[in-house]
């Protein structure tokens, strides 16, 4: 059993769920240092110093780690410099839930995007022994975007280092806590409960942020309501916005069709997963998709865009799960008026998606950590750790 120091600069939401799940399910001894889920830009710019101090106290109490795993919302290069006197030289993994090269800029963000935070990501990748990305979509997009970033350097370009860093990049999906998510009946129409006369229950369960493109979903729902299509809707998920105006307007417009709204505690959320028929997304950005995985595991028929990480999630069920660009309203309409037919197109997806259950993926995490702790898969200078998975 290895001792693993887990550094989570943004302990909340999907980041916090990942860190907590790893601690609960791993066979290794995990020691966690973290900061709350707030001020993410400051975490990336300045969190290294205070996280290094927390790491110093953790090492003094628990002993030096065999492996260090650092979540990506911090300056890893700076953090390693600040911890060099007490940390020793354990292998270091950078885990990327997202990256700032590909993350869409908020329309409310002041000023133009700069290279500062993307370079924090790059320097972290350069100093890590291994880089774990939560999806092939993120890994491949990141590696494709890096040359353009690095080519903008005025001199001493880093482009020559890209190949060896790419060789240390692996796909290691996040685990999802599905133990309490009900196992559906295989989405076989004749086995499902009778249809609700008010129509299928449509679930929106993502963050209420610009990158999830809620406006497209809410507009589609309003149009379908105006056409007289029968449906109910649950508009739930994390919301840190002071004025989620489009959601408030949608709630007022849809009226009694809205059966749940806003953040739900775990018990209420799981109950909602059990009652929902359809999960919908129009996300501009999705490097993995925990909320959608939860809904599909519970038997929801997915109505998802063709891009992002979604093809990777649904695999051979793509024709029944993904809609072409611009066809959200049409696909959602078709699913709502023929729910049983669309259920039949995705039979088996609910079982296949459970490959992301923590109880399944933890073996891969633990084996990777054990190999690193043993020192048999580490060579930061030559990039000989093997190619991407």
What do the PLM-derived regions correspond to, one by one?
Residues 42-46, 326-327, 340-376:
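A charged, aromatic-enriched C-terminal amphipathic alpha-helix characteristic of glycosyltransferases
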Residues 284:
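Aromatic "clamp/platform" in nucleotide-sugar-dependent glycosyltransferases that forms part
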């Amino acid at each position: 059993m290895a001792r693993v120091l887990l550094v989570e600069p943004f302990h909340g939401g999907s980041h916090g769920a990942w860190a907590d799940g790893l601690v609960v399910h791993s066979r290794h001894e995990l020691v966690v240092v973290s900061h709350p889920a707030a001020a993410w830009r400051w975490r990336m710019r300045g969190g290294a110093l205070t996280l290094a101090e927390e790491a110093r106290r953790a090492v003094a109490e628990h002993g030096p780690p065999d492996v260090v795993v650092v979540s990506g919302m911090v300056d890893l290069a700076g953090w390693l410099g600040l911890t060099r006197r007490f940390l020793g030289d354990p292998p270091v993994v950078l885990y990327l839930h997202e990256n700032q090269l590909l993350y869409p800029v908020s329309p409310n963000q002041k000023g133009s995007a700069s290279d500062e935070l993307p370079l924090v990501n790059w320097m972290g990748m350069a100093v890590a022994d291994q880089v774990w990305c939560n999806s092939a979509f993120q890994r491949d997009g990141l590696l494709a975007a890096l040359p353009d970033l690095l080519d903008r350097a005025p001199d001493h370009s880093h482009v020559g280092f890209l190949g060896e860093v790419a060789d240390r990049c692996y796909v290691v999906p996040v685990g999802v806590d599905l133990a309490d998510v009900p196992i559906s009946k295989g989405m076989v129409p004749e086995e499902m409960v009778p249809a609700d006369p008010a129509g299928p229950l449509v679930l929106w369960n993502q963050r209420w942020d610009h990158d999830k493109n809620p406006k497209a979903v809410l507009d589609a729902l309003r149009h379908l309501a105006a056409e007289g299509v029968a449906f109910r809707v649950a508009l739930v998920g994390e919301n840190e916005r002071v004025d989620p105006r489009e959601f408030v307007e949608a709630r007022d417009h849809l009226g009694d069709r809205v059966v749940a709204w806003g953040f739900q505690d775990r018990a209420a959320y799981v109950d909602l997963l059990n009652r929902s028929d359809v999960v919908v997304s129009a996300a501009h950005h999705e490097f993995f998709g925990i909320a959608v995985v939860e809904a599909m595991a519970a038997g929801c028929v997915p109505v998802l865009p063709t891009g992002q990480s979604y093809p990777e999630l649904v695999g051979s069920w793509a024709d029944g799960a993904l809609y072409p660009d611009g066809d959200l309203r049409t696909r959602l309409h078709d699913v709502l008026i023929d729910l049983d037919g669309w259920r039949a197109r995705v039979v088996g997806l609910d079982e296949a998606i459970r490959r992301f259950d923590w109880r399944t993926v933890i073996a891969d995490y633990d084996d990777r950590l054990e190999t690193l702790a043993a020192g048999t898969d580490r060579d930061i200078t030559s990039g000989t750790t093997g190619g991407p998975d």
